[in-house]
Amino acid sequence: MNKSFILSTGSYLPRKMLSNNEIASIVETSDEWIRQRTGIVQRHIADEGELTSDLAVNAAKSAIEKAKISVDEIDLIIVATTTPDKTFPSCATIVQSKLKCKNAFAFDVQAACSGFIYAVTVADSLIKSNNRIKYALVIGAEIMSRIVDWEDRSTCVLFGDGAGAVVMKSEMGRSGIISTNLYSDGNVDILCTNGGISSTGDSGKICMNGREVFKHAVDKLTASVEETLKCNNLKITDIDWLIPHQANIRIIEAVVKKLDFPIEKVINTVDKHANTSAASIPLALDYAIQESKIKSGNLVLLISIGAGLTWGSVLLHY
């Protein structure tokens, strides 16, 4: 059976940065308030003319260049996003067009902040079951600044824009992706938008019950790690690096405390990027590799939770 591994990573962050102090000039908040409750210091904001597909393409180009392959060799493109350019066609096919990946098939995955975990799982499954696929391009890309209510200080301080990408390769006998686990529970009301194409005719803005999200995030992310360890006969001490969804430093710290896992082995980019939804995990992964934190042979666990609720994990040897 063919197995998959992550061959390369790439990322893209818009040039414009928005500090906490700048947000404090828009809504009633402060740098201290945001830092203490979220760990966020700044976030990147897409330019007016930038589209989600543009962010995705830039991240993809970086990953493809590092993989040392041509766009013609890519067989599959999956884009995880909640902020596509259009209702249709998919963001993935727009990315395909912009990259000129003529030999790939492409589609989107929508699982909110868990989207990249879902997309990697789907790509891994397709690689294992389809001999046609040698190289898969998986991207998480979001422009969250377009769906936040900039008058709601409980949500507008949390989100940022960006994109991260990986090139996954199929190879007989080699396994980078060890296991994946996906979950959802239909608890849709605690984190959602207040609109949609079939209900209001527009995308709506983000609405969130922060306390409920925090409680569910800590419990479900912890359980996801424990289930992954159990399924693979591992102990928490076997994990070299944990990359959690970069939503809030308090959630990350609470999960790490429950797992009795050293914070020094947790990748944290929430201060730099804020919550970039489906882009969060690939951005953090690329950052950790570029900073020489994650090295070849390391056992890495990716975990995320998002609206739906959806959550899951990917365990991999890098």
Swiss-Prot record:
<dbReference type="Pfam" id="PF08545">
    <property type="entry name" value="ACP_syn_III"/>
</dbReference>
<dbReference type="GO" id="GO:0006633">
    <property type="term" value="P:fatty acid biosynthetic process"/>
</dbReference>
<protein>
    <recommendedName>
        <fullName>Beta-ketoacyl-[acyl-carrier-protein] synthase III</fullName>
        <ecNumber>2.3.1.180</ecNumber>
    </recommendedName>
</protein>
<keyword id="KW-0444">Lipid biosynthesis</keyword>
<dbReference type="InterPro" id="IPR013747">
    <property type="entry name" value="ACP_syn_III_C"/>
</dbReference>
<keyword id="KW-0963">Cytoplasm</keyword>
<keyword id="KW-0808">Transferase</keyword>
<feature type="region of interest" description="ACP-binding">
    <location>
        <begin position="246"/>
        <end position="250"/>
    </location>
</feature>
<comment type="pathway">
    <text>Lipid metabolism; fatty acid biosynthesis.</text>
</comment>
<dbReference type="GO" id="GO:0044550">
    <property type="term" value="P:secondary metabolite biosynthetic process"/>
</dbReference>
<comment type="subunit">
    <text>Homodimer.</text>
</comment>
<dbReference type="InterPro" id="IPR013751">
    <property type="entry name" value="ACP_syn_III_N"/>
</dbReference>
<dbReference type="Pfam" id="PF08541">
    <property type="entry name" value="ACP_syn_III_C"/>
</dbReference>
<dbReference type="GO" id="GO:0004315">
    <property type="term" value="F:3-oxoacyl-[acyl-carrier-protein] synthase activity"/>
</dbReference>
<comment type="similarity">
    <text>Belongs to the thiolase-like superfamily. FabH family.</text>
</comment>
<feature type="active site">
    <location>
        <position position="275"/>
    </location>
</feature>
<keyword id="KW-0276">Fatty acid metabolism</keyword>
<keyword id="KW-0012">Acyltransferase</keyword>
<dbReference type="GO" id="GO:0005737">
    <property type="term" value="C:cytoplasm"/>
</dbReference>
<dbReference type="InterPro" id="IPR016039">
    <property type="entry name" value="Thiolase-like"/>
</dbReference>
<keyword id="KW-0443">Lipid metabolism</keyword>
<keyword id="KW-0511">Multifunctional enzyme</keyword>
<dbReference type="InterPro" id="IPR004655">
    <property type="entry name" value="FabH"/>
</dbReference>
<keyword id="KW-0275">Fatty acid biosynthesis</keyword>
<comment type="function">
    <text>Catalyzes the condensation reaction of fatty acid synthesis by the addition to an acyl acceptor of two carbons from malonyl-ACP. Catalyzes the first condensation reaction which initiates fatty acid synthesis and may therefore play a role in governing the total rate of fatty acid production. Possesses both acetoacetyl-ACP synthase and acetyl transacylase activities. Its substrate specificity determines the biosynthesis of branched-chain and/or straight-chain of fatty acids.</text>
</comment>
<dbReference type="GO" id="GO:0033818">
    <property type="term" value="F:beta-ketoacyl-acyl-carrier-protein synthase III activity"/>
</dbReference>
<feature type="active site">
    <location>
        <position position="113"/>
    </location>
</feature>
<feature type="active site">
    <location>
        <position position="245"/>
    </location>
</feature>
